[in-house]
Amino acid sequence: MKQKIFNYILLSWMVVLTGYTIIESRKAPPDVEFELKLNDREIMKDLEANVTNMLAVCEYYDVKHPRIVTAQAILESDNFESELFKEYNNPFGLYNSKKKDYFKFKHWTDAVAAYISMVEHRYAGGDYYRFLEELPYAQDSRYIDKVRIIESNLPP
């Protein structure tokens, strides 16, 4: 009898802990500084935002489709000239729904790390454009077409 009670209590605690773990894992992550390679800030802090540097940073961080992601940055930031980009260092228009404002980064290269954490980590393979279509990323119905055109005009 004691063994049954013990097993019941043990099982109950396991269920509670499992449930708690699942709930905690689904909560929004705390506000974090999006950096993948912490020592790189000194190296990258002087990089000007342009196509060449965006491609290089995307490749450095092993972005799976650096040309498409660079094209997204060009479109979203109006070729790195938008107010959002200038004030927030946010070339992708990444939005913080918790704060009801766009994410603000110390440097535009941090936004590349954030893109990986917030968008690309969901990518399971296959057609990246289809993946982007399925995300609630852009409100423009021609977004994917525009990104394709920009990508096709990027330097090799």
Regions found by a protein language model. Give the residues of each.
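Catalytic cores of secreted/periplasmic lytic hydrolases that degrade extracellular macromolecules
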Residues: 2-156
